[in-house]
């Protein structure tokens, strides 16, 4: 089972089908539009476990979470929902003892009405699972996570994910609060990207105070805000106006020029960030040019998606960018994700493995 943004089930299914085919795992996706999840039916027993081990979760763009389904339980009686779930799990071989439990729903307005129930249900369900030795007495992040996903009041899927190959977040969504002093809600996109792409233990080194960043298409400053908040200095590139609160910090230099024409005055930029409303292929190529010229060490940018053929567009743009970087002898690590705060766009992160530019 794969969670995704409501309305992006086809993209998620297409991606999973491609990954499964590459692994020679045969099956087919089952989906309904606007449900916020995709099920992939494997033809062979044991292949669901193989998929969640061998598909690299951090290489999936449209999936927020994945777990192997052990059982589907429907028509749960209101007076005892626990026993049928325990019985269903007891009937299945190969379900590992888990170290944590997440009782979730897909991210749709309809399903979210069940979240209050999920919270109340978690404690008694946890105790019952511990009583049956299906869950460890103490929470452990070293062994699998048990997922119970309710898609309707009496209907759930029960399964497990591996902690070294899943999303660490409940429902696959980081819980972030909008900062009252941020100039726009877009600030949450960049904050979420930091949580998803950069391990927390590396934040002090890679998001360090005193670094320089460049924000292409910066106005009014939602993304610049995240760098300023971390005591960085920023070249903000936009013909529009920046929020005065950011300019007053003394950490921002505003350049009223075209983002495609700006060149940093000194080659001391660590972070290149970009949320321009432009054709995705054009933005991706611009990011590649900055990196191979050695103008930035890490790039984080959004690619706006077309109305149709969204998955194909994403694949093409990322493949073209990878080819461009390789041809120029640039070594890199690339991740892309359709983040919770993204809508008709995906966020891409590239880190230079070697900061020595061939140019």
From Swiss-Prot:
Q: Where in the cell is it found?
A: Cytoplasm
InterPro entries the record matches? RlmM_FDX (IPR040739), RlmM_THUMP-like (IPR048646), RNA_MeTrfase_FtsJ_dom (IPR002877), rRNA_MeTrfase_M (IPR011224), SAM-dependent_MTases_sf (IPR029063)
Q: Any idea which positions bind S-adenosyl-L-methionine?
A: 186, 219-222, 238, 258, 275
Q: Catalytic residues?
A: 304
Q: Name one GO cellular component term.
A: cytoplasm
Catalytic activity, per the record?
A: cytidine(2498) in 23S rRNA + S-adenosyl-L-methionine = 2'-O-methylcytidine(2498) in 23S rRNA + S-adenosyl-L-homocysteine + H(+)
Might you name a Gene Ontology BP term for this protein? methylation
Q: Which domain of life is it from?
A: Bacteria
Give the keywords, sorted: Cytoplasm, Methyltransferase, rRNA processing, S-adenosyl-L-methionine, Transferase
Report which residue ranges the record marks as coiled coil. Answer: none
EC nos: 2.1.1.186
Q: Which Pfam families match?
A: FtsJ (PF01728), RlmM_FDX (PF18125), RLMM_N (PF21239)
* GO MF terms, alphabetically ordered: S-adenosylmethionine-dependent methyltransferase activity
Describe its partners and assembly state. Monomer.
Q: What job does this protein perform?
A: Catalyzes the 2'-O-methylation at nucleotide C2498 in 23S rRNA.
Q: State the family named in the UniProt similarity comment for this chain.
A: Belongs to the class I-like SAM-binding methyltransferase superfamily. RNA methyltransferase RlmE family. RlmM subfamily.
Q: What is this protein's record name? A: Ribosomal RNA large subunit methyltransferase M
Taxonomic lineage from the root = Bacteria, Pseudomonadati, Pseudomonadota, Gammaproteobacteria, Vibrionales
Gene name, per UniProt, is rlmM
